[in-house]
Structure formats: C-alpha cells, structure tokens
C-alpha cells in the first residue's frame, strides 16, 4: 500500500511517503513559513522524487490534532481534498503520538506548548496511549506524572524544562519534532474514516470562542470542550 503521511500541527512541517511499512521518502522542516503555502509543494516534490504519480497513492494519513489551529485546518483540509479527489482512504492519528518516535522504558509524555503554561499532552507506554490526549495546565501534568516510576518528556519541552527538572530530577527531557514516518506507520492498519465527517481534534476552544462564551453564559457548557 502506498501511503502519504503528513503533519502540520506545529511550527514543523513533516511529510513522508511509505510503501507498507517501508519508508520511501521523508522531509521535516522547521523554517517558519505558512504551511498552507509549503505543504502541497513539499508533497509534490516527494512524490516526484519517489517516481510516483498522485494516482499511485492508496491512503492518506494525517496528524489530526491537537496543535496549532491554523496548522490543523491546513492539514485536514488538504488531506480531505486529496482523499476525495483521488478516491482513496483517509486516516487520522494523534499529533502527540507522532512525537513519541523513540524506544524508552517507562512512560513517554509528549507535550505541545499551548501558551500560558498550558500544554497539549498525552501519556504513552509501549507506543500506546494510557491516558487520553488532553489540554491541561502544566502544573496538573506534573502532578499526574508523579504516579509513574519513570517518565520521559518529549516534544516542545524548552519552556517547561526547569519545571520538569524541579519535579523530576531524574526524568529524561528530549526535544523532538513530529515524525511523518511514524504517522504513516500508525495509520497503516487503522480503519479509514468518512471523508466528509473528518474534522481536526482541537481539544481546546479557539480564543474567539472563549471570548464569545464569556458574554453568553446562557449557553449550555456541556456542548463545549472543557476550558482550562
């Protein structure tokens, strides 16, 4: 199966081509450019370098969230357009799981900076989620992590390293970028989704919605994602 996998959920852009589990081509760049401008040219370049045609693709696997609102919208819209135009499978995987491309003992905690000392976070062990991905205050993440004997923090860790070291002097802290190759591997055996119903997993309301809700308290909050 020929797979196109990509992630634009953060400042990094990662794109990979796989044939079943074999990596054919991959590129990850962190140049601060608009993903909406860079994504399709990067895909076109990799497909051409691999000697493939767009019609050769059989499955699209995309990081569905959480992450940058704009980045997720770009990725999901592109994935849906390609899947629909080529009439092929579409699969979404966790952006946080895409940061866990390493083999370590214990629990891996991928984080993405959500500003104001908040993060998008997951807890993974042996490649599997043991706690659902969520948006949380980083102080709560540190408290929850105390139940695990050995932890490794990965992802956008730079702004949180001091807090981690204070709470977990023995913890491993690794800055890591999303891996489109891992995204492709994760999506290889997952069932395809309904293209029309496919949406980003934001895990947090956008700021404009937060501000609107402050002046519309009559809205039933059960219909919205929990605010941190």
Located regions from the model:
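N-terminal beta-alpha supersecondary unit
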Residues: 1-64
């Amino acid at each position: 199966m020929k797979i196109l996998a990509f992630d634009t959920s953060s400042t990094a852009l990662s794109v990979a081509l796989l044939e079943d589990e074999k990596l054919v081509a991959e590129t990850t760049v962190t140049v601060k450019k608009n993903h909406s401008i860079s994504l399709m040219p990067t895909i076109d370049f990799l497909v051409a370098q691999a000697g493939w045609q767009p019609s050769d693709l059989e499955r699209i696997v995309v990081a569905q969230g959480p992450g940058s609102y704009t980045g997720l919208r770009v990725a999901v819209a592109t994935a849906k357009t390609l899947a629909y135009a080529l009439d092929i499978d579409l699969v979404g995987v966790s952006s946080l799981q895409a940061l866990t491309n390493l083999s370590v003992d214990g629990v891996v905690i991928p984080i993405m900076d959500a500003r104001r000392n908040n993060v998008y976070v997951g807890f993974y062990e042996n490649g599997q989620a043991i706690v659902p991905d969520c948006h949380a205050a980083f102080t709560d993440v540190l408290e929850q992590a105390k139940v695990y004997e050995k932890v490794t923090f990965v992802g956008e860790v730079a702004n949180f390293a001091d807090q981690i070291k204070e709470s977990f002097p023995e913890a491993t802290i690794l800055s890591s970028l999303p891996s489109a190759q891992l995204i492709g591997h994760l999506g290889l055996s997952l069932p395809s989704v309904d293209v029309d119903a496919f949406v980003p997993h934001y895990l947090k309301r956008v700021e404009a919605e937060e501000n609107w809700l402050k002046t519309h308290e009559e809205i039933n909050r059960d219909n919205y994602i929990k605010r941190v």
